[in-house]
Amino acid sequence: MAKKPKVPSNTIALNKRARHEYFIEDEIEAGLALQGWEVKSLRAGKANIGDSYVTFRHGEAFLFGATITPLNMASTHIVADPTRTRKLLLNQRELDSLFGKVNRDGMTVVALSLYWKNAWAKVKIGLAKGKKLHDKREDIKDREWHVTKQRIMKNAGRGS
């Protein structure tokens, strides 16, 4: 029997550190205003959102710190800036809600993942509150206990 072809993942980049550094209160999907060379690079998977965050200027949201590396075959007449700020495409209600929570509650907005939705590049942003060191340690303990518990359950099932 022939193997089934693997379905390519829609995920382009993940920010795993964000869930370790912050409590994620809310997640919102936003579009990105991209240039042509950036879309080509995203298709090749050359993106990093590890240090990216969202700021607000003139009533609009912008993604800072996201790196999209240009391809080697990119056009020479266009100057490609890998770390340029990119406008987020959100509706006014979402913008007002995020802006209010960031200014009033002292929260921040971080990029969680970058992915394809149909032919459009989307970024999942999270409304986040910073964790203290003891919170991070608590999360690590909980994760380790969960893994140990799963291992015990697996071995208990084999014993009979």
Curated annotation (Swiss-Prot):
Gene3D superfamilies: 2.40.280.10. One of its GO terms (biological process) is trans-translation. One of its GO terms (cellular component) is cytosol. The keyword Zinc does not apply. Keywords: Cytoplasm, RNA-binding. One of its GO terms (molecular function) is RNA binding. CDD domains: SmpB. InterPro entries: SmpB, SsrA-bd_prot, SsrA-bd_prot_CS. This is SsrA-binding protein. It comes from Haemophilus ducreyi (strain 35000HP / ATCC 700724).
